[in-house]
Design a protein with these regions (language model features):
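Short hydrophobic/aromatic patches on beta-strands that form ligand-binding or substrate-lining surfaces
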Residues: 1-9, 58-60, 107, 122-126, ...
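Extracellular glycan-interaction surfaces
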Residues: 2-11, 24-93, 320, 326-354
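Secretory/extracellular carbohydrate-interaction modules
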Residues: 5-14, 233-296
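Acidic glycine-/aspartate-rich tracts in secreted/extracellular proteins
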Residues: 6-12, 39, 63-68, 80-82, ...
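Trp/Tyr-centric glycan-recognition "aromatic platform" motifs on solvent-exposed beta-strand/loop surfaces
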Residues: 19-48, 285-316
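Extracellular glycan-interaction patches encoded by glycine-rich segments
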Residues: 39-43, 96-122
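Extended recognition patches within non-cytosolic domains
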Residues: 67-69, 74, 83-89, 121-184, ...
């Protein structure tokens, strides 16, 4: 088996592949990678996998006919063989897995136990029948020393398959999300999946999401691949920021508000503090810039970390006040980190007659913005979807940045989606 996976949450079981007889490959709730079969843990790594911004390449290579026990099952992560295990108990010689038999097989579920579905992104899923292949058949190291996928050119065997997850249908055929493109037509039936679950966020182009490990007060729940946020009224001024910290370049994203939010825009992660780590802070404290709702008014505002006080930054040629934002509105953000400007719009129109492409009527960022800023959402009972180019809500029009991303409204010229392809070019 070879696949790529990006975790969205710790403390859960994330099943990659399973079959009957309690045989599966998964990230366990203790953040270790586990291979289970023959009624036991074959491998349980000492290494912990906790990075919600990273894609992991997992290869499990099996040949139980090997006389040397240590050669029967091999586990690789990002091209390197795992050898440090909490549990290492190789299967018996000639052990017959259920994976290649006519029994139920599950990608992204544990077929014998409900509730172990992964919270994350899955891509480039190969199952090779009859061969024990190492990672170099599926990946390679690029010029920057990063392990990346490459095209597999070998055969799949009778029961093998390749899932590219490029289709959007919900049936077990060539148009379905579970389409097998190996040529074997071993199609899988999508369950509880829809077209919106197919995303551009892949191992070849990693998109920003909200960062689940950000400390917060109150109740905050992330879902839809960490692009939807639901905040409790007990969350006060607490929220989540993105997995990308931006220090240069020009960037565009959108937020669809479902239930009124308290604040949305940007923060400087290096200034982020809360009262669990700093008793002098009365709740949350950080520099931010963006939309702030207070006393039924919506304004553009910046916050100074010192004492948690607020201050209005300037809007060149315009006003800090903006129209009230309602449910289902889509808020547009264009960030110019090269010049220290932020532009905000609603439903296709930038406020204060701003023009990000020409650099006019901008909102000025905090003076220390060069420390790096991240898109950010605060709640106090609000709900929203954030779209960095990988939307988890329906897009009626479809606009890219010229090459990547999918947005409701046109991306200003010279601005780009928050993805690794664009960061490499312009970040």
């Amino acid at each position: 088996m070879s696949c790529w996976f990006k975790k969205c949450e710790d403390g859960l079981n994330h099943t990659l592949f399973s079959t009957t007889g309690t045989q599966d490959i998964r990230f366990a709730s203790n953040e270790r990678l586990l291979v289970y079969g023959e009624s036991k843990s074959i491998f349980n790594t000492n290494r912990l996998f906790r990075d919600p911004s990273a894609w992991y390449h997992i290869v499990v290579a099996c040949d139980t006919t090997q006389s040397t026990a240590s050669n029967r099952v091999k586990l690789y992560v990002n091209g390197t063989q795992e050898t440090d295990f909490e549990t290492n108990s190789q299967p018996s010689q000639n052990y017959d897995w259920n994976f290649n038999h006519t029994v139920e097989q599950g990608i992204g579920e544990r077929v014998t136990t409900a509730g172990l579905n992964p919270h994350g992104y899955l891509a480039d899923f190969h199952w090779i029948d009859g061969q024990q292949l190492d990672p170099t058949y599926f990946g390679e190291t690029n010029d920057n020393g990063v392990w990346i996928p490459k095209k597999y050119t070998g055969t799949y065997g009778t029961n093998g398959f390749f899932m590219e997850f490029q289709q959007t249908g919900t049936s077990a055929n060539s148009s379905g999300i579970g389409a097998d493109t190996s040529g074997n037509d071993n199609h899988f039936t999508p369950t509880n999946l829809a077209a919106l679950d197919v995303t551009e966020d892949t191992c070849t182009n990693n998109f920003a999401t909200l960062l689940p490990t950000v400390r917060h007060t109150g109740t905050i729940t992330l879902s839809e691949g960490n692009t939807k946020i639901v905040t409790g009224t007990d969350s006060q001024n607490s929220g989540k920021y993105s997995t990308f910290v931006l220090t240069s370049g020009k960037w565009y994203w959108e937020v669809k508000q479902d239930v009124n939010l308290n604040t949305m825009g940007l923060i400087i992660p290096s200034t982020y503090k809360d009262n669990t780590t700093d008793p002098s802070v009365g709740g949350m404290s950080h520099y931010y810039a963006g939309i702030y709702r207070q006393y039924n008014n919506t304004v553009m505002k910046s916050r100074n970390q010192s004492g948690g006080s607020n201050y209005n930054s300037t809007v060149t040629g315009g006003s800090n006040s903006i129209p009230e934002i309602s449910a289902n509105d889509i808020i547009m953000f264009a960030l110019d980190m090269d010049n220290g400007y932020l532009y905000v719009g609603t439903n296709g129109t930038f406020h204060n007659s701003a023009d990000p492409a020409n650099g006019t009527n901008a909102f000025n960022l905090p003076t220390n913005y060069t420390e790096g800023m991240s898109p950010h959402i605060e709640g106090d009972g609000g709900t929203a979807h954030i779209n960095f180019g990988n939307p988890a809500f329906s897009i009626s029009s479809g606009n890219s940045d010229g090459k990547y991303g999918n947005f409701e409204y046109a991306v200003p010229s010279g601005y780009y989606a928050l993805c690794t392809k664009r960061l490499a070019e312009f970040g």
